UniProtKB/Swiss-Prot annotation:
Subunit structure, as described in the record: Heterotetramer of two alpha chains (FadJ) and two beta chains (FadI).
Organism: Shewanella sp. (strain ANA-3)
Function of the protein: Catalyzes the formation of a hydroxyacyl-CoA by addition of water on enoyl-CoA. Also exhibits 3-hydroxyacyl-CoA epimerase and 3-hydroxyacyl-CoA dehydrogenase activities.
Protein name as annotated: Fatty acid oxidation complex subunit alpha
Subcellular location: Cytoplasm
Site (described: Important for catalytic activity): E116, E138
Amino acid sequence: MEKTFNLTRREDGIAILMMDVPGETMNTLKAEFGPEISEILSEIKRDSSIRGLVLISGKKDSFVAGADISMLDACQTAGDAKALSQQGHVVFNELEALNIPVVAAIHGACLGGGLELALACHQRVCSDDGKTMLGVPEVQLGLLPGGGGTQRLPRLVGITTALDMMLTGKQIRPKQALKMGLVNDVVPQTILLQTAVEMALAGKRTAKPVKKSLVNQLLEGTGFGRNIIFDQAAKQVVKKTQGNYPAPAKIIDCVRQGMAKGMQKGLEVEASHFAELVVSKESEALRSIFFATTEMKKETGAEGATPRKVKKAVILGGGLMGGGIASVTTTKAKIPARVKDINEKGLSNALSYAYKLLDKGVKRRHMTPAVRDNLMALMTTTTEYKGVKDADIVVEAVFEDLALKHQMVKDIERECGEHTIFASNTSSLPIGQIAQAASRPENVIGLHYFSPVEKMPLVEVIAHAKTSPETIATTVAFARKQGKTPIVVQDGAGFYVNRILALYMNEAAQLLLEGQSIEHLDKALVKFGFPVGPITLLDEVGIDVGAKIAPILEKELGERFKAPAAFDKLLSDDRKGRKNGKGFYQYAAGNKASSKKKAVDESVYAVLGIKPGMDKDLSAVAERCVVQMLNEAVRCLDDGIIASPRDGDIGAIFGIGFPPFLGGPFHYIDTLGADNLVNILERYQAQYGDRFEPCPRLKAMAAEKARFF
């Protein structure tokens, strides 16, 4: 049986401990490694010829990417999870207690348990490579660093910096890591091992303390000051999470207790809190998302199909969406993109959009001006169909006009090769209707991005009846290269995301017309766990956009999608939302919010002919909106729009910000119980009408006490 850890001795007395998990592309820490590491550490202690130890990875591009998350699912109880954390403590304490210098030589991902392993070493040196990132992202899985990270990190880099890392899960680049004292040196990968050996030979066992500002010294150096830091962090956590995520508060408590009562007490608290989080419903939901997205990365989107390589892309339309799509194509996928627009202004906008995004990277020192300029060189523009013949994929991002899109299809089929894919970014028009203009309908597909393109992770890949499996697979692979999470959905009005969002938004509108205030509505859904409330979202998306989509959905899917007629009054009053600085909220010049907390434009109530002040309980308001979304998500599964509950969960979380700690609509239905959800829907149906009628599948599941997972 192949070993994961291999110890070799050099003539100069330095031992190299190489970690290389057999058969895996990245190193992850597993429970079964404990005895193996302990045995090696005992061997090192017995050998007096060993003067120092260097820990390095045998993998090409990763140090240790973290702990193997599947270990946690094997934990039947909190006691099992606590034992797992304690085992890590024993091994890392043993490593730290070695009486010879121990140096971690880091190249590639050094995350979670990987960073905790490095923290147990006496010094750290990392490569200056772009692939090298350090961090403790456990909070993103509803967990905390359970291998001593909550104790060693604040002692190394300071409480404020450590809390920032642990509460956000942010990843740190090499130069930043050096500046903050997380590593002792940053060197080219070619001399990484040599440098680590020299550090071990130098015999230093402790790192030089990082220089702190006077304010930080005063705050972190006294019990009173530390309490200010912890109290402030706790307030920020509640504000950001609405109390929906238990991990951040437990991270703060681990650090607070460890700094007040010592390392040993801190480790005890860490193990207990880690165990509580492992078995929490929030972490289970967040881990399900992690496993789902990992699983999806292995799929092509069309069984048995092999994607073609995309070497060149063309984007039709230089507007906000077109510019964003071109930008992620060049900067993320590193694929040349040619933007075609009917006028120079559109092209100028697309170039400016891409440049501003890249220049932000330069200002934040994530890239050099030369890298920015090289990426910009991948984007070219044209007002005619020149330089488009060899395109492998054309992404159309023009106005939502079927005749215009038909013309685009004909133009591309005339100007490009037989294999060229035509991908429409339509948000509402069925792809089958767009493909009616095509002589090669098998090449036509939907590729629905969400705005702003560079920030929103989801894309819907929409196959119509004649789309070929190869077209689907190629489009999915293209979207992944752009850094997106694609879900394949079938053709139909609203596809999946906009369809479930529409009923949620309509219900919020009904509540507004019944007298719920705008602030109350938004507050209710933010407290429930959405990133923004429905009224804020409508302002952001555009009231006019919502008005265009609603009739299409109503025509194709029925009366339940009918938008409140009162909203026509908003358009008559020229209220489009943030885009024209006139919507539900007030906007200052330049369409920027007038303050951090936006103020409601009170005049909107008069336009709608309503009087606010009938505010109901926050949870009741949220429930009415959310159950509409849940019911429609199940309908989409029944209609074959989505292939599985897993895809439905990922689409809702990454497309509209459905609360991740609930695991997605289908996981949440399992938590509620289909029978409970049916009862809630039937209660609302009796009060408000048939738009709340539970779909047949939900009723059947309720009768059988069935689950999705």
